Design a protein with these regions (language model features):
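N-terminal secretory signal peptides that target proteins for export/translocation
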Residues: 1-6
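Bacterial N-terminal signal peptides
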Residues: 10-22
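N-terminal pre-domain/capping segments
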Residues: 26, 31-133, 152-156, 227-229, ...
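Histidine-acidic metal/acid-base catalytic patches
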Residues: 31-49, 65-66, 155-163, 183, ...
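Acidic-and-aromatic substrate-binding clefts and catalytic sites of carbohydrate-active enzymes
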Residues: 55-63, 79-93, 109-120, 142-147, ...
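A structural motif
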Residues: 76, 103, 197, 261, ...
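Conserved beta-strand positions in the central sheet of alpha/beta enzyme cores
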Residues: 80, 106-107, 134-136, 201, ...
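Active-site acidic/histidine proton-transfer and metal-coordination neighborhood
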Residues: 104-105, 112-232
């Protein structure tokens, strides 16, 4: 082969290699654009809320500054805080760290009743810092027989205790009376929080209070009392348990609750209660599709409830959510599942 032919062959191979590299780069950039073209959309990262990233869900037990630095690194613009009794002395530090890093304190989990001195003290903290997180309120812990064992409870013991509390909660009072009692309790919190510019939302957790029909009944009762701005926080992680299963009729349920929902917290859905990442479960895809097609607009929370290092948990939740968002927009465009698919005992998986 002549020198000229060698040069021609080398030039051809180089051009072919460039085409391969450029093609690979083009496909990667196209995938990236697909993931980011919905910026400003429902599943966009700037619409997400980091939730349940405090200990014990964060194995690294980060303090306020470390925690907020982590959120900033991951790109979160909104944060919902899960307080514990021992954290009250760190509330100021938490809020100040969020302000330094430009992250919005969107919500604050609130277990307290209006007559609890800590409730007013917490609101005074918000006033001092000029922040207005929405209070995510679940069932009252007042009167609940919550044991405080010296040692850790096993997973089975925790499960049995939770089931016991759920059953007791269901039989507290006749339905009409229970709705009135809960509406009165929430109304007291609304009145306490209103002078501080703070609003309230019902948080579906467990038991009677965590069932959507009951929460809607409470909201409607509040409307009769002249209270019209109480919303609902809907949690995928509490969409089903041994007492109910929202996934069986979610499209119909969503039509009912959509007008009240202010935030949806996303996770992977499993019938056995195991915590899995978005895209690993059996129902989150259909539920997200129902929500998206309904035109609902609100914040979307990602939960580090799975445990371990909260940063890694949130990263994996972002990966799973991004994959689902692409699949919702262009079925098949997301590529392989980012995590192993987990099926229930019947082998069910819906996408």
């Amino acid at each position: 082969m002549t020198s000229l032919n060698y040069k021609r062959l080398a030039a051809f191979l180089m051009a072919f290699l460039v085409l391969i590299v450029d093609g690979t780069r083009f496909r990667a950039e196209a995938a990236s654009r697909t993931r980011s073209e919905s910026a400003g959309g429902l599943w966009a990262h700037n619409n997400l809320v980091a939730w349940m990233v405090t200990p014990p869900w964060d194995a690294k037990a980060r303090g306020p500054e470390e925690r907020v630095q982590m959120l900033e690194k991951l790109g979160f613009k909104n944060y919902a805080f899960m307080p514990h009794d021992k954290d009250i002395l760190t509330y100021d530090a938490e809020i100040e760290a969020l302000r330094r890093h430009g992250i919005n304190l969107l919500a604050w989990r609130f277990y307290l009743d209006a007559d609890d001195p800590v409730a007013k003290a917490t609101l005074e903290t918000f006033k001092r810092h000029n922040v207005h997180p929405r209070l995510w309120v679940s069932q009252s812990l007042k009167g609940m027989n919550l044991p405080r064992p010296h040692g850790k409870m096993s997973a089975e013991e925790q499960h049995q205790l939770l089931m016991q509390l759920r059953r007791e909660d269901l039989t507290k009072a006749p339905q009409e009376l229970r709705v009135k009692q809960e509406a009165d309790r929430i109304n007291s919190l609304v009145k306490l929080a209103a002078p501080y510019g703070i609003k309230v939302a019902l948080y579906n957790h467990n038991g009677w209070f965590g069932m959507m029909d009951n929460q809607v009944a409470i909201v409607e009762r509040l409307k009769q009392l002249g209270v019209t701005d109480v919303g609902i926080v809907y949690n995928f992680s509490h969409a089903r348990d041994e007492l109910h299963d929202d996934t069986l009729n979610f499209p119909e349920l969503w039509k009912t609750i959509k007008p009240y929902v202010v935030t949806v917290n996303i996770t992977g859905m499993q019938t056995d209660g195991d915590l899995v990442y978005p895209s690993q479960g059996d129902s989150e895809f259909d539920m997200m599709r129902t929500i998206e097609r309904s035109g609902w607009r609100g914040h979307v929370g990602l939960i580090a409830e799975k445990g371990g290092d909260a940063e890694m948990t949130l990263r994996n939740y972002l990966v799973g959510l991004d994959w689902l968002a692409v699949e919702l927009k262009h079925p098949g465009a997301g590529g392989p599942h980012p995590f192993p698919v987990v099926r229930d005992a019947s082998g069910r998986h819906n996408y």
